[in-house]
Every structure is written in C-alpha cells, then in structure tokens.
Amino acid sequence: MMVGVVFGLHRLFFCLYVYFYAYIIYNKSVKGSEFMNQLEQIVEISAAGNGVLRTSEVISKGISKTTLAKFVEKYNYERISHGIYCSPDVWKDGLYLLQLRCPKTIFSHDTALFLLDMTDQEPLQYTVTVKSGYNATHLREDGVKVFSIKKDFFELGISKAKTPFGNEVFIYNPERTVCDMIRSRSQIEIQIFQDAMKQYIRRKDKNLHLLMEYAKKLRVNHMLSKYLEVLL
C-alpha cells in the first residue's frame, strides 16, 4: 500500500517537473520569437526614418525601452540626444537631427534660402527662428544662429522642404523668407541678400500678392516696395 502511494507521488512530481520544464521552454521560445519580431520592427522603423530612431516612436509600436536599449547597443547606434539615436551606417543629416532635437524651431533666413534653392551658398551655420521667450541658449552653444519673433507671427508662412539627404523639415516659404531677409538685412551678407531677392523674382511660383501681405504684417512693406521697383 505504502509503496503504491510513494510510486504515485513520485509519478505526480515527475509529471509536474515535465510540465513546468515544458512550460519554461515554451515561454522562452515564445519570448525569443517576440524579441526577434520586435528587433525586426525596430529595423523597419529605422529604415523608414533614414537611420534615425526616436524612443517615442518605438514605444508607440508596443516595443519596450529594454528591447530598444539592446538593439541600440547591439548595432552601435549613436545617441544624438535624449530619445534620439542614429545608425552608424548613414550620414548624419544635421538639419533633420537639429529639428528632431528642437521641434519648436523653424529653419529661416539663409538656411531657408538654401533649402528653397534661392542661393548657391551652403550656410556656414544653421539659422532658425523661435517664438519670443524661447530659451535658445543650447542652440547658440551649438553654433546655431537664432532669431526670435512674436508668437503672432511665428507660424506665418510655415512650409516644408527636403534636406539634401531627403528628410523633411519645417522652413518658411519664399515670401516669408524674403520678408525675414529684409527685416534682418543688417545681419545678412549684402551679396546673399541681393542674390536672394533676384532669385525670388525669377521664381515661377512666386506670389507677389502674398509677399506684400506678409510684408505689411511684418512692417517691411515700404522697404520691400523699394527693392521691387528696382528688380521688376
């Protein structure tokens, strides 16, 4: 009788052992499969972002920070700033990365001219415009030229353009950029300023009505009229 009970208990414990062992193996297999699937997802996100990963975007796909950290370490991604990583296999797009780091900036003035094909000169430093009151100390420390404007005019003429690397960034449209150049003419090289005005007049998509509308709002309409009299 006792032998039967012992044998029964032994068999029960053996079955439980096999069950839990199988359960652990299954879990590891499933988790391993899920982990690989998540890595593949991160690769796809990186490819779609031209080699750039944002933590917020990865997490929004249901991928954990731990998995992202392992991916970044495994594939030697460089940390550009908090929550932004760049693949070692791509050229770093400074314009795109700057706006990812500082999304409250708009590329303006000579940087906008460059992206709008209104100058042949690649800017020596990036130029952005921010709302008045924005703390731009970190930008200036990074060598970025910063202009500020009242919030009422900050969004006037916002547009999009592609960087030389094909990434999309926010800039001001040609009409707003011309007005900005006039407003800040004392801080702009005269040759760049004159060439920009000539390039604008040559544009097939120029909108003189919109230009004058912006000029009135930004209070440069009288100065603009003088330049247009010479150029038109």
Each language-model region and where it sits:
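Short, positively charged and aromatic/hydrophobic N-terminal segments
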Residues: 13, 17-28, 32
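Basic amphipathic alpha-helical segments that dock to polyanions
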Residues: 70-75
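Residues in the helix-turn-helix
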Residues: 67
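Targeting/processing segments of secretory and organellar proteins
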Residues: 3-5, 10
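A detector for short, charged/polar N-terminal pre-domain segments
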Residues: 30-35, 39-48
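Nucleic-acid-binding surface
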Residues: 38-41, 51-57, 80, 84-232
